[in-house]
Amino acid sequence: MRKLRKDTGKVVRAVCMQSALGVLVAFGAVRTQASTLPQEWKDALSVPAGYAFARHVEHVRTWDFPDFSVDFYRQANGPGTVQRVFVAVPKGGSGKLPAVAVPFYYPEAMLGFDPATGEELPKFKGVTMLADLARRGFVAATADAYHLTYRTDATEPRDDFKRWKKAAEALARDWRRWTGVGKLTADTRLLIDLLAADPRVDAARIGIIGHSLGGKMAFYAGCLDPRVKVIVTSDWGIDWDRTNWNDTWYWGAARVAAMKAAGRTHADLLAYAGGKPFMLIAGKYDNAASARAVLDGVPSCRDPERCVVLDHASGHRPPPDALEAGYRFLDKFLKPNSNNKETK
């Protein structure tokens, strides 16, 4: 138990470097311009007409810990639904602070413990990004994913994938043209709303990071939301064929097939992001080859300093040094006057 206390630019070049962390793959272009978003993406990701709800956020309570505090909010995330949000705030900060959204399955996971009870959650050891970032001086926010919020009558445990399936089926019945990944993206952008409105946050310095499911959410929301200035993702499947995009709670097999037939790839979203810094930490569901196959076509990857793939090739969960490289990438672009240097 824890004690509570647009497609222009020259051909992209790829540079591979061996490091102690694994293979670093960087992509760059001499010039860049934000693309328009292809219609297939708009159809799948745009919030459907009629999906309207009153925006509100309720502060529930605050927990205090040695290095940071955690504010607990309930935030409206759809017609008749709310998501729980944890915002971790570092101790000793002054002025307006940089902030990072940390999407994942549920908030406690990104802390590594339940702040209400002190119960440790060892399953998430090594990816407790919310706590890690607060200790680095960021305001960090995370929330429930929609499998926990869309069905208000759900009784399945939060880690039961039957709950994902039922939530996705309900979403598809209610909003036939939408996708699960569209809902995930919309809910993640609500975290950006909350951070941008927080008086403790410098709204010009907001980033996003995520692992696995959280990596998917971070990539989509980070590419689509201009308020996000830097994106870090970990092992989420940048190539259509390397992870479970066919599952109903993401795209569903028919929608993935249609996107592939139309020639759509995740390069479209990164091009639309217009050159904002992007880092992919690869390990199992991503690797250097799959990332290069997608990202070689992205003119908005300006240079090897701003568009980087680190392939640690050691499995799905990032080792500490790889995750530290991701944190330093955030530091580099959100704390320009700090002494942190990007891991090479």
Residue ranges and their predicted role:
Residues 53-93:
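N-terminal cap/lid segment of alpha/beta-hydrolase-fold proteins
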